Amino acid sequence: MLSSYRNQKKYKQNKIREVGPQLPLWAWKEIAFSINQEPYWYSTIRLQGLMWNKRGHKLIFVKEENGYEYWETTNKQWRMELRRDLRLIAQINFRNAWQYKSQEKWNIIGIWYDSPGEYRDKEKQFWFHWRIAMCSCKKERWDIRDFMVGKHRWDLCKSCIQGEIVRHTEPRSLQRLALLHIVRNHVFQIMPLWRARRVTVQRFPWSGTEGLYDTLVYTGLLGHGINI
């Protein structure tokens, strides 16, 4: 028993610990500022980003043209187009480098970063459609027009369902409790928080593979011939 204990202790001493993503100091300061505005902000972003990374659709590189990198989602039924300005990236200005396409116009993503706590209102369109495009749930017989007038959408994953319930019901209300109870057995992979903290963060905000901040966002809508 004593020998086994010593081996375990030696293993722990020799184990290389990863401190976390190696970000510049200004990035840590601004992330901390956002966390202080909404305590759940960072952990929610990391968890949902990981879930989509494992089972959802991906954002893939398409081409480079005229100083921009063009990207699109692998979800062909609900396709979104994004691009990033390489000149801004060269200036280490990642916040305003990304743009999304809506009604044939390119809109800057990153307004939320200037005013933490209000980004959901400022870029609501982008956030909403990013979630739909990245989620791998089947969206059969589902129309955005039905959703906008208040019809339920039970064909989405548990995470999406719970998010909409929480968004459109009052805190601690009986309505919210009843709806969450209905969907509690919906199949979905839950990602524990300790795994979320171990994922490296790079230059791309919304994926575990290409991002500076794991910043969960929805994008402008292309697909099903729908314009915003």
UniProtKB/Swiss-Prot annotation:
Q: What Gene Ontology cellular-component terms does the record carry? A: host cell cytoplasm; virion component
Q: Does the keyword Hydrolase apply?
A: no
The entry's keywords: Host cytoplasm, Virion
Compartmental location: Host cytoplasm; Virion
What family does this belong to?
Belongs to the ovine/caprine lentivirus group Vif protein family.
Query: Which named protein is this?
Result: Virion infectivity factor
Per the UniProt record, the source organism is Ovine maedi visna related virus (strain South Africa)
Q: Name the gene.
A: vif
